[in-house]
C-alpha cells in the first residue's frame, strides 16, 4: 500500500499541514493492520553493516578517500549522513522537540506536556518529506532525541530538571495539593505526554514513509555501567528491565530497535566488553519479544572508537561488539562516526588506515560467517542466533578454513576457502535459526503465514 501523494505538499505552511494530520492518522490506522518488517534488511544478507558517517567530508575537504565499498558495507551515495539507505534525525531536524537548555531555558515549551504536539507534527510532516523525498524510502529511519527520557525514573542527574519543572507545573495548577499528590500527577502528565510525542512521531513517519525502519536511537537502554564492580556480569539491573517493560507502547510502535553499544573509555583493557555488549543487545531482543514481535529487527549502534576518545577499537573489541551482535541474531549494526572525527586530514587518514587494515576485514569476516551459517542451517531463509548454552560462540570464520586477501590491483577483498565438516557441525551445535517472516521449521524450510 502506498500513501497518498504527500510529497506534493512539501512547502505547505504549518497550518495547512496540520489540517492533514487527521488524514495521516486514518492512514496510520490502516497501516497498522498490515504491519510487516522486511527480513533481512538487505536481501540475502542476514547481517548488514550500515555506515552512518559523514566521511564525504574526508574526500571533499581533505582529499582522503575512505573507501568502504570493498567491505560489503551499506552506505548513502557520497557517504552522507542522510540519504536513501540511512537517515537520522537529530532533535533540531525533526519538528519542534521541547527541551531545556543547559542554562535551564525552555525551548518549545521545555516539557512535552507543556508543548504543542500539533505544531510539532505539522513541522515534522514537512521535515520528513524534505529529508525523504522518495515515497518508497525503505532504509533506516532513526530519531535521536536525548534531552529527556520517556520514563520518569530515568530522568536523573542533569535530566532531573524535567521532573522539577513538571512538579512546578502541577503545583502552579493546584497550589493546595500536598507533595505526594503533586508528584503522582507530575509523573502521570510527563509520561503520558512523552508517550504521545514519541509514539505520535513514529506513527506520522510510518504513515509518510511506511517502508522505513523507524525507531529511536539508544532504546532500549540497559544501564549496565558498573564496570568497577568486582562481580560485574554486564546484566541490566532488574529495576531497569522493569522500567523497560513499561515502554511496550514504544517497542510496539517501532519498526526496528537501535540500542547503543558504544564502548565507554572505562572498558578499555578490562576484558569486560563482551559482557557489556551481550546484555545490551539481549535486552533489545527481550523487549521485542515482550511486545509480541520477536522478529523486530535489532540494529545496534556502534563506533570505531572508544566513546569520547580517539582510540580505535582493536580487533578483539570488534569481535566483542560487531561479532557479538551477529552471534545474537541482530539484523546488523550501524557504524557511527562523529563530525569531529572527520574534521582534519590527519583524522581522515587515520580512519582510512583503520578501515583498510582492521575494520574492513572484520566486517567481511562476520558478514560472511552469518551468510554461510544462514545457508547451511537455515536454508537461506533465516539468520543464525547463538544457543543460550553457548554464550561465547561467534560467527567468526575459522582461520584454518578461510583467508581474506586483497584483490590484485585494488578492489573488494576476496574471501577464499570453504566450510569444513567440523565448521558445519560446530554451527549446528552452537546456533539455531530465527526464520524470516513467512518461513518456519527448524531449518526455515517451510513457507506459509501461520
Swiss-Prot record:
PROSITE patterns: EGF_1 (PS00022), EGF_2 (PS01186). Residues 1-35 form the signal peptide. It is found in: Secreted; Lysosome. The active site is at 146 (proton donor). InterPro entries: Aldolase_TIM, Glycoside_hydrolase_SF, Hyaluronidase. One of its GO terms (biological process) is response to virus. It comes from the Eukaryota. One of its GO terms (molecular function) is hyalurononglucosaminidase activity. The keyword DNA damage does not apply. It catalyses: Random hydrolysis of (1->4)-linkages between N-acetyl-beta-D-glucosamine and D-glucuronate residues in hyaluronate. Glycans are attached at residues 85, 231, 365, 398. GO terms for cellular component: cytoplasmic vesicle; extracellular space; hyaluranon cable; lysosome. Disulfide bonds join 58-348, 222-236, 373-384, 378-433, 435-444. This is Hyaluronidase-1.
